[in-house]
C-alpha cells in the first residue's frame, strides 16, 4: 500500500479536531489527496456505535462493554474506509485510533492496557499509523475549553471526573514514552499558530520519508508500562 496513515490523539479539549481541519486544508493546497475521518465513527455502523457509546444517558455502561464497542466500531471503520483509502494512495488523517482505547479504557478505566490491546489487536489485524500526533494538555484547561465551546457536543466522557481525565493524560504519556518512534508529543496549551506550525512540520517530515502505512514493530505487545 502506498498511502499514509496518521492518527491524532489527545485528552478532551486538546484541540486535535481543529488541528486536523487546518492540516487538511494545508495539505490539499499542496496537492495531497487527503481523507479525514474520526473514531468512533467514520462509517454508518461505527457512527451508530458512537451514538451508543457517547450517549450521556448510559452512565451505567460497563468498562469492558465500552472497550468492546470501541473495538467493534474500529474494525468496521478500518475495513470500510481506512484500508480502501490507503490502497488508493491517499493521506489518511484519523481523529483518534487505538491509542484512545489504551489510554481511556486501559489506563483510566483500569481494565489493563494489555487486555485492551488484545481486543484491539484482533480488530485492527496489524494496521497501525506510521505517525501518531499526541496533543498534550492539562485536563483542567481542556475541560474549560469544552465548557466555553457551545458548538461542541458534550458527551458521556466529558462528564467524567477530573481524576479520570488525569489518568487519561498519564496513559497517553506512558504510551508516548513506550512508542517514541511513532508518537510525537506536542504541547497543545500554546497559541494555536504555534501548535499548528509544529504539527505541520511533524507531518511533512513523515510525508517526505517512508510511505509505510503501519509499523510492524507496533504489533509487539510485550511491554506496555
UniProtKB/Swiss-Prot annotation:
Q: What is its EC number?
A: 2.7.4.9
Name listed for the protein in its UniProt record: Thymidylate kinase
Please explain the role this protein plays, according to its UniProt record: Phosphorylation of dTMP to form dTDP in both de novo and salvage pathways of dTTP synthesis.
Similarity field: Belongs to the thymidylate kinase family.
Q: Which GO terms describe its biological process?
A: dTDP biosynthetic process; dTTP biosynthetic process; dUDP biosynthetic process
Source species, domain of life: Bacteria
GO MF: ATP binding; dTMP kinase activity
Keywords for the protein's UniProt record, in alphabetical order:
ATP-binding, Kinase, Nucleotide biosynthesis, Nucleotide-binding, Transferase
HAMAP family membership: Thymidylate_kinase
Describe the reaction catalysed, as an equation: dTMP + ATP = dTDP + ADP
Q: Which GO terms describe its cellular component?
A: cytosol
Which positions does UniProt annotate for ATP binding? Answer: 10-17
